[in-house]
Design a protein with these regions (language model features):
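The conserved beta1-alpha1 loop
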Residues: 4-8, 67-68, 193
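Conserved alpha/beta-hydrolase catalytic His-Asp/Glu region
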Residues: 131-183
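Conserved serine/cysteine hydrolase catalytic core
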Residues: 162-212, 216-231, 235
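Gly/Ala-rich beta-loop-alpha elbow adjacent to hydrolase catalytic centers
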Residues: 66-71, 75
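Conserved HGGG/HGGXW glycine-rich cap/lid loop of the alpha/beta-hydrolase fold
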Residues: 2-40
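Active-site loop/oxyanion-hole signature of alpha/beta-hydrolase fold enzymes
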Residues: 35-64, 77-81, 103-114
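Flexible "cap/lid" loop of the alpha/beta hydrolase fold
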Residues: 80, 84-86, 90-132, 171-175, ...
Length: 252
């Protein structure tokens, strides 16, 4: 199998290196995408369309598409644009759009039985800095270690922190998203929750799982299993492709 990896906020393709190496050891292939505004494409404009197109250009027929954190949002847009190419889509502690809603709305909404909006972002904001041009940075190593990498050794956490880049949102926080082809395609799909996650609250992971109509898979890691347990993550991703949905997709 061939896996296409989409990183989350502040990260870039580099974060998947160890997981791809582990997959290759299992007899599979993997490629990671730098989204515009990140990694080798840090100077490119970050828009919903640019990010979607960067992923679509990497997908080959039958690929497994993997989105982490906010990258789940981008991966879904790519799957909407190229549903005929995607063999499976896996969400690793990742976001899922809500039809007709913006990204911040999708991230803040609980299931209806739990109430509408929950905009609490916790203490993490205290570790962020904002440039005059609107770029957002994770400015503090201790904060990154706490929220992203707490189960990594310090050397690994520092290696990752030194590679974090700015997050430039462009239109990604303001534009309502519609992905009708994704909902209609009913693609094979899975969700992996990180049991020690300090970035994605359990209620949000549970909400995304229910909206995907899948049984939740788990890995006992921080928000960044690609660094702390890449071999275990690789094995779980391979297993995820053998699972099938247990219910329908819920667009909103």
């Amino acid at each position: 199998m061939r896996f296409v990896f989409v990183h989350g906020g502040f990260h870039a393709a580099w974060c998947w290196e160890h997981t791809i190496a582990a997959l290759e050891g299992l007899g599979h292939e993997g490629v990671a995408v730098d989204l515009p505004g990140h990694g080798a494409r840090v100077d490119e404009e970050s828009t919903l369309a640019n990010r979607r197109d960067a992923i679509v250009s990497a997908i080959e027929p039958g690929d497994v598409l993997v989105g982490h954190s906010g990258g789940g949002f981008d991966a879904t847009l790519a799957a909407d644009a190229a549903a005929d190419l995607v063999g499976h889509i896996s969400y690793v502690a990742a976001a899922l759009p809500r039809e007709g809603r913006t990204y911040p709305e999708a991230m803040a909404m609980r299931d209806s039985e739990e109430g509408e909006f929950d905009a609490d972002v916790g203490e993490m904001l205290g570790y962020l800095k904002f440039d005059d041009d609107g770029a957002m940075w994770f400015a503090d190593f201790d904060g990154a270690w706490k929220y992203f990498y707490h189960d990594c050794d310090e050397a690994t956490a520092r290696w990752a922190f030194e590679r974090l880049g700015p997050e430039r949102f462009g239109d990604t926080t303001m534009t309502p998203v519609s992905v009708p082809a994704f909902w209609a395609a009913d693609l094979p799909r899975s969700f992996i929750r990180c049991l020690q996650d300090q970035s994605m609250p359990q209620w949000l992971a549970d909400t995304v799982t229910r909206r995907l109509g899948v049984e939740q898979l788990t890995i006992d890691t921080s928000h960044s299993p690609f660094l702390s347990r890449p071999r275990e993550l690789a094995e779980l991703l391979v297993h995820a492709t053998t699972t099938t949905p247990t219910g329908p997709l819920v667009p909103d």
